[in-house]
Amino acid sequence: MVAELVARRASVVCLVRDQVSQSHFSRLGLEQKTVVVNGCLEDYPLLERLLNEHEVETVMHLGAQTIVGTANRNPLSTWESNVRGTYNLLEACRRNQRTVGRVVVASSDKAYGDQPELPYHEDAPLEGRFPYDCSKSCTDLISRSYYETFKVPVCITRCGNLFGPGDLNWNRIVPGTIRSAIRNEPPIVRSDGSFVRDYVYVGDAVAAYLELAEQMDRPEVVGQAFNFSDERPQSVLEIVDCVLKAVDCPDLKPNVLNQASHEIRAQYLSAEKARELLGWSPRYGLTQGLALTVAWYRELLG
């Protein structure tokens, strides 16, 4: 996201909690091309000062604790980051509406919880039960409340599983499988491999967020939530197979642990609303996205 905004010659202010030397942000030298503010979403005075001093016009709320396993082990810190962080930021935006003209909030397909009908549409209830899922349901509802009550110009994005360059969480299935395959090691599948998700290339997600932000002056768009998906759901074993082929290691077999808990078995999205209202569709898709992703990890891992 930051790289694309810089390429568009935007003036970008980044709130950075942790400096990671191998991060995509650092490797691209984006610290020198943006204004970096060190801090966290839990620090409300910092957020208000940041928005005020830099006269921020568009807010992309992407910060969160995003790891399901971490949320199960540490629900309090997850809710502090994801729930408190969201209402802190939206309150700061409310108090700076003189300059803040649009806010895009990243929710998740997990906000829906376990729904009886697939694919999920935007009018499905938000029923997250497990800690991470619940945090995203809250993020979603708080954002809608700030729009309905205070007319803070908010839109909400709900994506499936994002993948692409820059993800250094090796517990996620795509980066973990790529690293294992590059090392010629069996990839680890923590579930039984049958869990179904949709996978969205990060470049398609960035395009979706920016397209949404650009169209928020339309009354039929502002205040709305949008699903973004390539609408090609895959089981875990299917996505592992796709990754292994992309790395050119089709004969490697995954080590299936069957140890997943507090996870929904099948979860994927309809992007019909985004197609019809925004004219959005994925440019890269799974195959091209994986090819670009594998190339990035090969360079990273040597």
Task: Annotate each language-model stretch with its function.
Residues 22, 113, 164, 197, ...:
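Generic structural signal for helix capping and beta-alpha/helix-loop junctions
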Residues 78, 128-135, 170-174, 198-202:
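The catalytic Tyr-centered alpha-helix of NAD(P)H-dependent dehydrogenases
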Residues 1-162:
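N-terminal Rossmann-like NAD(P)+-binding domain of SDR-like oxidoreductases, especially those catalyzing
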Residues 45, 57, 69, 76, ...:
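Residues in well-ordered alpha-helical elements
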Residues 98, 104, 114-116, 151, ...:
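Proline-centered turn/helix-capping motifs that create local helix->coil transitions or kinks
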Residues 2-10, 14, 181-302:
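C-terminal substrate-binding subdomain of Rossmann-fold SDR/epimerase-dehydratase oxidoreductases
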Residues 118, 169-176, 243:
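A glycine/serine/threonine-rich, flexible loop-to-helix segment
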Residues 30, 43, 166-170, 232, ...:
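Residue-level signature of the cytosolic catalytic core of signaling kinases
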